[in-house]
Amino acid sequence: MVDAITEFVVGKIGNYLIEEASMFMAVKEDLEELKTELTCIHGYLKDVEAREREDEVSKEWSKLVLDFAYDVEDVLDTYHLKLEERSQRRGLRRLTNKIGRKMDAYSIVDDIRILKRRILDITRKRETYGIGGLKEPQGGGNTSSLRVRQLRRARSVDQEEVVVGLEDDAKILLEKLLDYEEKNRFIISIFGMGGLGKTALARKLYNSRDVKERFEYRAWTYVSQEYKTGDILMRIIRSLGMTSGEELEKIRKFAEEELEVYLYGLLEGKKYLVVVDDIWEREAWDSLKRALPCNHEGSRVIITTRIKAVAEGVDGRFYAHKLRFLTFEESWELFEQRAFRNIQRKDEDLLKTGKEMVQKCRGLPLCIVVLAGLLSRKTPSEWNDVCNSLWRRLKDDSIHVAPIVFDLSFKELRHESKLCFLYLSIFPEDYEIDLEKLIHLLVAEGFIQGDEEMMMEDVARYYIEELIDRSLLEAVRRERGKVMSCRIHDLLRDVAIKKSKELNFVNVYNDHVAQHSSTTCRREVVHHQFKRYSSEKRKNKRMRSFLYFGEFDHLVGLDFETLKLLRVLDFGSLWLPFKINGDLIHLRYLGIDGNSINDFDIAAIISKLRFLQTLFVSDNYFIEETIDLRKLTSLRHVIGNFFGGLLIGDVANLQTLTSISFDSWNKLKPELLINLRDLGISEMSRSKERRVHVSWASLTKLESLRVLKLATPTEVHLSLESEEAVRSMDVISRSLESVTLVGITFEEDPMPFLQKMPRLEDLILLSCNYSGKMSVSEQGFGRLRKLDLLMRSLDELQIEEEAMPNLIELEISVSKRETKLIIPNRLRAFGQIYC
């Protein structure tokens, strides 16, 4: 486990040697020697892992190595900080820089020599403790792209959630959901121990076509052990999709009772389905039920819980359904579907070994799929190694195999994937994790290395998808064939928290207690109120990351003058001070909730963060002042509503730019944005005299663009047949996967052009107008998976029988109700049509 940290630090030394070309020779030589020694120590750590040495001596030695690796990182980051602070000085003070740099070099040489003495002591103790048999680090020397290619070969194709052994349960519960004679609000409780598949069964019901057709209003929310009723109510309101973004920001400030009244009003008189996943206390249901009308529309509520008393403790009409363990035959079927993906020939010995291990899983689906994910990447001969490892740890039948399987699966991960898994411990229980945000955080932390073939974000996505493929992480939402959000099962989250604690990796604070508290921990995370955290007044100068997931609160007690090594700041809903003191040279990620900005001098602060990679400002805030990003040449993602002007320089690595005004976009130099993948251009002015101009020529350089959104509250006339548009769109259409157009009035039918885009998977036309007929030919939209046409006006829409062969989601709504629709019946079955 410690090997993940040491390999990360070894990589950091290597990167530092490359980046600091002007480094003094003495510093360079000492660092190279230190890197060699730490690489060697890393090999012995791998040996400790491989031999499964868990004696106190090995643990003590591993702890020495862990502390040493962290101290190496501190020395490097502090030295880099001093160099950057000197490089920013101007005027006469520059004359002293040369002397200062030499003094800094002498200082780090002294620090490194102390570290070298320590590593010699660590080596002597290794020999004394008898830790030998050097094992080379796995994947050493491979480039990121090569490791990803190896992962890609081992990955399965996109797999829908497999539900084995629950077919009868699903049939019974579906009948309860669709019972037309039951007009009252009816509650279905699914209960059983963790890992049995309660959430999987509930999701199967929630996503079934019959349920979608029956319930126009559906919502899903998680509860968990540490819940706030107001948060749960807000999640239900958001999930229903009945409330505008502007309205959502208003009701975020409501008290709990006001939210109850608001949600009740939304659902009154409607046939709804609400899934409340993972309830631990009856009080949680008592807090929610007042907001869910007991109407006579045939509404339903599904509850999942581990506790029988909670399942049967709901009032009103209900049905409690207990999930059972899988039979051996069902267990083997589930295992076979996942474990044999890369094995062509299954001999008798292999089958026997597999069945012995599956038997030990005792019918627990989560244990079975994690075991299958572990074995699916191994050769038949390696199956015996896993089996032997299980037997060594299972001293008697009273020990459950699940924790052992989870631990083995973690140990088999590459160090990058281990760091990704550990990082999942920062998120609250049952939290739906936005995958793009997770990727941006992992890159900002320095855990991911790219190369000339692959961007760091692509590498990070593959490591996360490896966790999904191994069933260590669950995909929740997909778009365009990609995972967009994920969730970690609470049993696996417990594993991540336990290992993070052992590695001094994360401090997590909640209302009750810090799950792990240390003044030298790298990351500090607050899940609920900030007051408890700030009241302890700890000073952790080694902190690299601070993240806040709690409710609205004031930021007090964080002294940024002493936190100069910070790489990640995600303030969440904290009310920010007027300014942040200190030069945060190492900062790579800054996340801000718009409701918390107030007098925060966002423009002045952002412009100083020269090495920032990701700037995220939540979409509930419109930045109307000009933001100067010209010195921020490392930017990769700029996310927010920047309508006051955005000054951008040479940012070749910029991949995300959402959203800026049309005027700001037209002033940029798109030829510098060669890696831009996601672009959002929006106009906020509602003036009818205001004419918005789309410069199509500005898009011709964006050959990497995948997602394009153009939005305006005023009517913008758009032609896709002008010479400029045709020339520009011919370039970007080759890469586009998603197009969203809002408030556009088309001068001609856009479909003949849009349907030819070879990679287009999502098309959304919202509040658009076209006075004519839209036609989709038989060969049109070959890869399209989602089509939303929410038009203000449209005379006619015709889709030929063979068009859109891959469509799985369809919604058509036209305010002008006399629209003529000619749509194949097979497509009508995929969605909702209101015309």
UniProtKB/Swiss-Prot annotation:
Outcome of mutating N666S: In strain: cv. Nd-1
Source organism phylogeny: Eukaryota, Viridiplantae, Streptophyta, Embryophyta, Tracheophyta
Phenotype upon changing N641Q: In strain: cv. RLD
GO cellular component terms, A-Z: cytoplasm
Molecular function in Gene Ontology: ADP binding; ATP binding
Effect of S767H: In strain: cv. RLD
Note: In cv. Nd-1, it confers resistance to Mask-9, Aswa1, Edco1, Emco5 and Goco5 loci from Hyaloperonospora parasitica. In cv. Columbia, it confers resistance to Wela3 locus from Hyaloperonospora parasitica. In cv. RLD, it confers resistance to all of these loci.
Domain NB-ARC: 144-453
Family according to the record: Belongs to the disease resistance NB-LRR family. RPP13 subfamily.
Effect of H586P: In strain: cv. RLD
SUPFAM superfamilies hit by this protein: L domain-like (SSF52058), P-loop containing nucleoside triphosphate hydrolases (SSF52540)
Name of the protein: Disease resistance protein RPP13
Pfam families in UniProt: LRR_14, NB-ARC, Rx_N, WH_DRP
